[in-house]
Design a protein with these regions (language model features):
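Bacterial N-terminal signal peptides that target proteins for export
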Residues: 1-10
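Bacterial N-terminal signal peptides
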Residues: 9-18
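Sec/Tat signal peptide C-region and signal peptidase I cleavage site
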Residues: 20-25
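A compositional/structural signature for long, glycine/proline-rich flexible linkers
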Residues: 26-472
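Residues at the start of alpha-helices and the adjacent loop-to-helix junctions
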Residues: 2-3, 17, 53-56
Length: 472
């Protein structure tokens, strides 16, 4: 019996062995999906590989442009200011007769008095800023991320006070008696707005200027005799270019900024994007001739891409204030740091900094009696783009809920600068005596020439043949 069982088992094994080649012959080789998709497991054609690497470099440059625009926006303002007025913690330019179209800067507000300066904590160490009372202001880092509001929404509650701004790497003692904040960047943007008084039928800037000139800035540890006296140059009536670069200097200025600031100022993933186009802190930036072409293409195309998004609007409609009207909010429902409910809205952030600067919690808060709102429109009531060749009437209803003031301003759609019309200040506000209609409403007119019967304070001049946006 044992011998018979062994023979049967051996025969069965031979039979199975005989079946294996047949089963294997019926199976087809399985290639992975990516192998099928990319050249059947072989390297790319060298020309295709070069082309794809160039395309990736270009796409990364576009992404870098959009991501770093908030910083370049601030750098443009700083460089234009310091070229005109000089730099230093003690230099605080004030637009004492209000800002007009001769100052090229994104969406300036001609209806308050602007004070703007650029502090360097790496050079000067911790700085103390004595802020005036009743200022509408903020300190931001150079990505225009709010360090703190100043004024009614800030810790001083419109009483003014001493703010202590610490560098990002500061580890020393922190004295009491200050509103103390630490900046993520060595460079800090100081932006104060002071409110004008109502004069004889028009705004009176003098009290606002006087208040702004009570600002003081000095190093925390400086000996009093070594503190530089404050300088308040007048920015009004001067032609000043404070716009961000539109050519290859965008990249050289970005590289200088990356080198100057601490590593922690920029998150690692963004640094990775910058590294992929050759911008690495502490290393030479030497793009090849081909990369120079791609960088130039990116700095030309990226702003068009941002503008295309602004022009076409959002599929989710979050940019609209009302479903039945054309007014938009430039934050599109996001926080002042561009956070939607579950993501960072990088496209909306880029759209904002193409035409504006200075985003703060006070601008997006929904608290009655506090903060500010900036609804704008690029279209008329029928949905057509506003054109400077046409005549438009904006009706402001009676009882506008503005505690301090309301204002209406026209801007260029491309970069938010003021239209270069004969009327240097394309703005009006509630400080003017503007005739009211029988129902208490006010009519503001936009046109290349003033319509008959319209008072000067109710007219905003536009540039024929050019689109514009109107902000309330």
């Amino acid at each position: 019996m044992p011998i018979r069982r062994t023979c049967v088992a051996a025969a069965a094994a031979l039979a199975l062995l005989g079946l294996v080649p047949a089963a294997q012959a019926q199976q087809q080789p399985v290639t992975s999906p990516l192998m099928k998709q990319i050249n059947n497991g072989n390297w790319l054609d060298p020309k295709e590989a070069e082309s794809l690497r160039d395309e990736l470099y270009y796409q990364r440059a576009v992404h870098a442009y959009m991501t770093m625009l908030p910083a370049l926006n601030t750098i443009g303002m700083r460089d234009g200011s310091e070229k005109t007025f000089g730099g230093g913690y003690n230099v605080l330019p004030i637009w004492k007769q209000r800002m007009d179209s001769r100052t090229q800067v994104p969406t300036p507000n001609a209806d308050v008095i602007y004070s703007m300066s650029y502090l360097d904590l790496k050079k000067d160490g911790p700085l103390v800023v004595k802020a005036p009372a009743n200022v509408i202001g903020m300190f931001t880092d150079f990505f225009q991320r709010t360090i703190t509001d100043v004024g009614a929404i800030g810790p001083d509650r419109a009483r003014g006070g001493l703010y202590l701004i610490l560098p990002p790497d500061y580890t020393g003692p922190v004295p009491g008696g200050y509103f103390t904040v630490k900046s993520p960047t060595y460079n800090v943007f100081l932006f104060f707005r002071t409110i004008m008084a109502k004069g004889q039928g028009k705004p009176d800037p003098a009290p606002a200027v006087k208040n702004a000139e009570t600002t003081r800035v000095y190093p925390l540890y400086a000996v009093e005799k070594d503190v530089k006296p404050m300088s308040f140059p007048d920015g009004s009536a001067k032609r000043i270019d404070m716009m961000y670069p539109v050519d290859k200097t965008y990249w050289s200025k970005l590289k200088a900024f990356v080198d100057y600031e601490p590593v922690g100022a920029i998150e690692p993933e963004t640094r990775g994007v910058l590294a992929s186009i050759g911008i690495v802190k502490g290393q030479p930036f030497k793009p090849t001739a081909r990369q120079e072409e791609l960088l130039q293409k990116a700095v030309t195309t990226a702003p068009k891409m941002i503008m295309a998004n602004r022009q076409l609007g959002r599929p989710d409609g979050r940019n609209l204030y009302y479903k039945d009207r054309q007014y938009e909010t430039t934050w599109s429902g996001a926080t002042s740091d561009w956070m939607q409910e579950s993501y960072l809205d990088i496209d909306q952030r880029a759209a904002f900094f193409q035409i504006a600067y200075s985003s703060a919690p006070a601008m997006t808060m929904h608290t009655t009696g506090a903060g500010s709102k900036y609804p704008f429109t690029v279209r008329d009531k029928d949905g057509n783009f506003l054109n400077g060749s046409n005549t438009y009437k904006m009706r402001l209803p009676a009882g506008i809920p503005a505690e301090l003031f309301w204002a209406v301003t026209a801007y260029n759609i491309t970069d938010g600068t003021m239209p270069e019309a004969a009327q240097l200040m394309p703005s009006t506000n509630s400080y003017y005596d503007i005739p009211k209609q029988s129902d208490g409403s006010i009519e503001i007119w936009f046109a290349p020439t003033k319509p008959n019967g319209v008072v000067d304070a109710a007219f905003i001049q536009t540039v024929p043949g050019r689109n514009f946006l109107a902000t309330v």
